[in-house]
């Protein structure tokens, strides 16, 4: 088996290029695995011996051959600005849940919510420029014909150029009735100005994520959201014409 640790856009291409060369040379499968084990982010289980503690937790992982990295490291995309992004998607014939253009604004998160694995393992935070996002979204809208653009990241409202980006998207696509959606917003930095802007096209749903029903539990999971934040955000939403909002909660904390 081949396991990729971390973000895959760069390392996957490196593996495929190595595979093409291996196919030309027609060496053994073991030779191929040995060759790609030196690629940062690649972990080959067969090239390591794993020792467990008595309680079945991992005690140590050591290479069983020479010239194998002693410890595989996860791969991080340092330059998200120029990393390949899907620009020609397969559009299904049937209605699907995420039938929209999905625009990744940045990677990582600085919030540190204790329940969020992604917020911990995808650090550091790396933003894409507005110009790069304009280029991506223009190609995606033309190639798919979708009538909605979803601004997606671990915490979309933390994107430093969100106001500038939404200004562009509304100005550029409102005439074609292409709407903008902001999924899973934080209550403590919800901007009614941006919400008002995107509803000029159509009033998409609003989703907030308080995660827990009491302040004590929100503090325990380090959510950083107060009861007042929830009341203020929902009050503003209703005053602006929304008649419902979606709230995400975790059950069983």
Predicted segments, located by residue:
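Conserved SAM/AdoMet-binding glycine-rich loop
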Residues: 139-253
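N-terminal pre-triad scaffold of radical SAM enzymes
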Residues: 89-115, 141, 183
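Iron-sulfur (Fe-S) cluster-binding segments and ferredoxin-like electron-carrier domains
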Residues: 116-132
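Glycine-rich beta-alpha loop elements in corrinoid/cobalamin-binding modules
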Residues: 1-63
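Conserved structural-core and active-site-/substrate-pathway-adjacent residues in large, well-folded domains
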Residues: 1, 42, 83, 108-109, ...
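N-terminal [4Fe-4S]-dependent radical SAM core
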Residues: 45, 51-102
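Gly-rich Lys/Arg/Thr-decorated short loops/hinges at beta-loop-alpha junctions or inter-strand turns
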Residues: 92-93, 113-121, 212-218
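Structured alpha-helical segments in the cores of large, soluble enzyme domains
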Residues: 12, 101-109, 133-141, 230-240
């Amino acid at each position: 088996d081949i396991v990729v640790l971390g973000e895959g856009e760069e390392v996957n291409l490196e593996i495929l290029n190595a595979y093409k060369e291996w196919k030309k040379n027609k060496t053994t499968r073991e030779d191929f695995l040995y060759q790609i084990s030196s690629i940062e982010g690649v972990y080959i289980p067969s090239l390591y011996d794993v020792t467990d503690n008595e309680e079945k937790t991992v005690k140590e992982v050591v290479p069983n051959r020479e010239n194998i990295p002693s410890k595989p490291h996860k791969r991080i995309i340092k330059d998200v600005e120029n990393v390949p992004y899907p620009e020609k998607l397969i559009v299904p014939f049937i209605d699907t849940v995420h039938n929209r253009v999905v625009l990744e604004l940045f990677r990582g998160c600085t919030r540190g919510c204790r329940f969020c694995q992604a917020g911990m393992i995808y650090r550091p935070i790396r933003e894409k420029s507005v110009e790069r996002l304009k280029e991506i979204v223009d190609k995606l809208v033309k190639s798919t014909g979708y009538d909605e653009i979803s601004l997606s990241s671990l915490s979309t409202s933390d994107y430093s150029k969100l106001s500038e980006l939404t200004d562009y998207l509304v100005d550029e696509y409102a005439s074609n009735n292409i709407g903008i959606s902001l999924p899973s917003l934080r209550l403590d930095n919800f901007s009614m100005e941006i919400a008002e802007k995107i509803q000029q096209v159509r009033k998409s749903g609003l989703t907030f994520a308080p995660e827990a029903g009491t302040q004590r539990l929100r503090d325990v999971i380090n959510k950083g959201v107060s009861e007042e934040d929830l009341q203020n955000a929902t009050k503003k939403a209703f005053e602006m014409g929304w008649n419902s909002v979606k709230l995400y909660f975790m059950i069983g904390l």
